[in-house]
């Protein structure tokens, strides 16, 4: 916890960071173990996990877009009201919006890249499928941790 104190991170950000980090570690460990324990070749792993990863990134895109829309609505409603809100309120919303926008952008780009028919290409060396599986697994684990952090920040 000394690390967080030296970086001037408040409790709000610390809890979200720890929750996101735990989600990233758990999902990446699970995908790493699945890659080693299953006994499948990398191309088969990609083929079997691709529909689920597409669904995951599609869901994250929809969820993060909804959160951004609701945050925008919230700021418009609060700025139009006669009550005055604290500056920290708007700073918290801005932090959430920045992280959520990053999650949205990474998810959209990854979702589009995953829909390229690389699996059906015969000229690709088999060792690249292993790299591709671990890259997609790493990106999905990081996005999972980031969306968990956004949800914790909303709480």
Residue ranges, per PLM feature:
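Alpha-helical transmembrane segments and their helix-start/interface "positive-inside/aromatic belt" motifs
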Residues: 2-24, 90-100
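N-terminal intrinsically disordered, cationic/polar leader segments
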Residues: 3-17, 30-54, 62, 155
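Hydrophobic core of alpha-helical transmembrane segments in multi-pass integral membrane proteins
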Residues: 18-33, 105-109, 143-148
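Membrane-helix interface motif
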Residues: 30-44, 100, 110-122
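Membrane-interface interhelical loops and short amphipathic "cap" helices
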Residues: 40-56, 85, 118-131
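Transmembrane alpha-helix detector for multi-pass membrane proteins
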Residues: 50-116
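Membrane-interface helix-loop-helix modules in multi-pass inner-membrane proteins
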Residues: 103-139
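Alpha-helical membrane-embedded segments
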Residues: 133-155
């Amino acid at each position: 916890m000394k690390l967080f104190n030296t970086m001037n991170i408040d409790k709000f950000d610390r809890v979200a960071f720890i929750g996101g980090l735990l989600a990233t570690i758990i999902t990446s460990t699970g995908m790493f173990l699945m890659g080693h324990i299953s006994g499948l070749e990398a191309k088969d792993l990609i083929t079997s996990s691709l529909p689920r990863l597409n669904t995951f990134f599609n869901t994250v895109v929809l969820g993060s877009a909804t959160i951004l829309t609701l945050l925008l609505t919230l700021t418009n409603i609060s700025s139009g009201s006669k009550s005055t809100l604290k500056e920290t309120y708007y700073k918290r919303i801005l932090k959430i919006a920045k992280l959520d926008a990053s999650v949205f952008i990474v998810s959209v780009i990854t979702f589009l890249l995953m829909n390229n028919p690389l699996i059906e290409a015969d000229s690709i060396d088999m060792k690249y499928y292993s790299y591709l599986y671990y890259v997609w697994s790493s990106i999905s684990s990081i996005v999972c941790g980031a969306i968990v952090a956004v949800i914790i920040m909303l709480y």
